[in-house]
Amino acid sequence: ECIKVLNVFEKGLSKSRNLALKNATQKLLVFTDDDVVFQQKFEKKIIKSFNSYPIHDGFRFQFLNSQGNLAKKYPRTFRSRLSKLEILNSSSVELVFKHESLTNAMIQFDENFGLGTEFFMGEEAIFVSDGIKKGLKIGFVPEQLVSHSQPSTGQKTAISAIYFVQSAVFYRIFGKMYLFWIALKLFFDLKFLHMVFYKHLQVCK
């Protein structure tokens, strides 16, 4: 296959992805990164998924961390649709879409979000959410496509900045309900910190 490289001077990950979408020519679009390793026969997993569920416009798959383990807690079985939590937990390296479906629904990445902008994350969740709101059928397939070792933005950024950006992401997706999702995130974050602190105390004893 031929590889097409596009050089631009604009800044912003979402702008780059939209440029790639505009210049894409194949029937299926795989969103990837420059530091992933594709698993053997990943393309067969993709084709099989779309052949098995032809009414779907896109799928969220799984990816592995550098240790070869699942990078996240995923559903164990196929899902014909994504829950709100699964939408929020989407990463670009998990996503594959039909080119025609994105074109017909006029779906693009929101260029106000993503690396290179003030709101430096959440563009994938917004992209998936916008697709569902416009009628695209997006499911989940429990198959691994890539391994990806790069730490997430959240692992390298201050907590206050993360909450600021995620508040904007939640508002963009859920509108007036965004406060509920902020409160829910805070609850689970505090619960996680409590568990870590408790384990630390047990070790110290």
Where are these regions (language model features)?
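Catalytic beta-strand/loop signature of glycosyltransferases that borders the donor
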Residues: 109-111, 135-147, 159-162
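Short aromatic/hydrophobic "clamp" motif used to bind/position activated sugar donors
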Residues: 29
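Non-catalytic, C-terminal membrane-associated alpha-helical segments of glycosyltransferases
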Residues: 157-205
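Acidic donor-binding loop at a coil-to-helix junction in glycosyltransferase catalytic cores
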Residues: 114-127
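Glycine-rich, basic loop-to-helix element that forms the pyrophosphate-binding segment
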Residues: 8-24
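Conserved donor NDP-sugar-binding/catalytic core segment of glycosyltransferases
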Residues: 41-74
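Acidic donor-binding segment of Leloir-type glycosyltransferases
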Residues: 1-7, 48
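Short, flexible, basic/aromatic active-site loop/helix in glycosyltransferases
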Residues: 71-103
